[in-house]
Amino acid sequence: MLSDWTAECGPEDPVLVVPWSDPDKPEVHFIDLREHPYDLDHLPETERHPALLNALRALNASRSPVFTAKCDAWPIEHSPDPEDYCNNELTYLRLNLGYPSEETPVAFASYIDLLWRDRTIFASRHQHEQLLDRLTRRAVALDHSYAMLELVLRPAFVDLNGPQEGFAVSLYIKALGHDSESAYENWGRALSEVATLLRSKTFTAA
């Protein structure tokens, strides 16, 4: 699987703040799925996407090295507007994954914001960079030629058991398909294997 990571940690880049809430929709807010695992069954995103439900369950389990802060999933389909996000994203994926447009008319994507539980790792950019190097190297070996893993290192501020500044990782899985069903299946399989990889000894022992 094609895998890469970048950093968006400049002074103008957004900071992930946890806990968070949507000012326009107070009912939409951070849920600590480590403490409230049964709330997974009631999240709109997980009700629609079983693969996302399973990934969140695995990543917030007691033996996981990370926990999650935000997530979303969405289809990527052709738009009549040549400047539309979906068209640009489809072109980008086809170019990087090496598939022609007639074979891959659609795609599916998701993101999950991750935070390392270990406070020393959470606060260290250097350790995050080492972990992201390791994760992208391991993910390349996964057999998902239609899928792409993108990781973005971001600044974070967490105030759950006392305030702390550190870093978060936005994990994107994007997958092309011959049709909507195959794109969705390719995405789900890739997401599942990346979640499993994150819970392997390579990262739990970090």
Region spans (language model):
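Intrinsic disorder/low-complexity polar-acidic segments
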Residues: 69-206
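N-terminal low-complexity, intrinsically disordered segments
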Residues: 1-92, 205
